[in-house]
Amino acid sequence: MRRLVLGVLLAALPVLAAQAQSLVGALEWLPPGSLSVEALTRHPQEQLEGGEKQSFYVEFGRLAFRSPDMLGGTARKAGLSCQACHANGFATTAFFIPGLSSKPGSIDVSHAFWNLRGEDGIENPLEIPSLRGVKTKDRFGLDRRAASLREFTRRVIVTEFSGAEPDALLLDALVAYQEKLQPVAAVYEPVSLQQDLADLMRYLDALRVPLAEEEPVLAERMTVMIRGQIGFIHERFADDDMRGSRGLLEEWSRQLARIAEQAGKGQWVQARTALADLRQAIATPPAVLAADLPRSLYEPERLKSWISKPVR
């Protein structure tokens, strides 16, 4: 039976680039009706210990937490990230995949759909846990097998979701971010362009560190992740007549690619200058984004109509 479910799920799954938490990808690989407008237009406020002023490790971990590049196999192809199941550190109660979930907010993480090597032959969806206050725990995971947050994080990436072995810096960053998630009640807010652009500025601020330290590998890794987040925004401007907004976002992505290329060539002054220029452009974006916003998929009614159309 599990093999049949796996075959149906894989047959329905599009092959997507490993970019950000993909709106298009999520709508295509989830069965119709599984993903609600509510889940796509509202999320809990993040509320980090210490506010928005965080160390590089926390900011890099925050970016990685939202990047499908952390995962592998089906999850990465579908554009999923840690954020998909743990929105801003809370349990995503609307997450649901028929055949893998017993109810909204649950998922079978030991299924071949995610990792052939992790298949246990048992239908055992688990309730998605909140990561709030995780730094105070002495055991991790619903089975409490992991003795440290670092061990638990690695297991999720490698064993459950077939990701590549994370290096020490990446694990340090992911742990640092999770340890800043305060144990508070969820307060919901709209998913907004304003917040997404503010997040981009935070990612670009963090990117200044590897450029200042002249670390080309880390700079390239971060630019790939940030370009993915721009791709997420790009999907919200879905109409063909939004060429101005779409073109602007594509140009920002190209500028990041050039920064990575300059870093790879050791052109550090040029890379740092280009990053400063890009930060200024995003801090004061052209009016075209605001003009197109009422017709974008940030608007719940527009999104509802878009979801109801046949899968593209």
Protein language model regions, located:
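Positively charged n-region of N-terminal signal peptides that target proteins for export
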Residues: 1-3
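Short alpha-helical "patches" and their helix-cap loops
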Residues: 5-7, 79
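Bacterial N-terminal signal peptides
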Residues: 7-15
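Periplasmic c-type cytochrome electron-transfer domains
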Residues: 17-312
